[in-house]
């Protein structure tokens, strides 16, 4: 099974924000995607490391598509998410990659119980790394329905 047209080996999943969740999933075995690592990073840490991650030829990228709504506008200016999305868009363009976007509303499918069931759980931080893992899980399930059987918990 091939996950996408780029024949990627890895999936880089990003939940952008002031604290950004990032994870890398190994897709070599389509029936058993494996979390390589997950982390929660600051904006500066993201700036320092994202180019090296996105530029890897065998890596596909998925990111949460953050939208400014009336409600988010009331909470804060929140430029970080949009700025980070723009940076990732540019780096993907520069690397000749298609960037996949996911809505925040897609995350609830990948609840904590499902993340733990397939060892996609991150310990520590404020939950942003787990949100990146949620986007990774949704991306994998959208492309491999067989893997969904493992999620029936």
Segments (PLM) and residue ranges:
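Phosphate- and other anionic-substrate recognition elements at nucleic-acid/protein interfaces
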Residues: 1-153
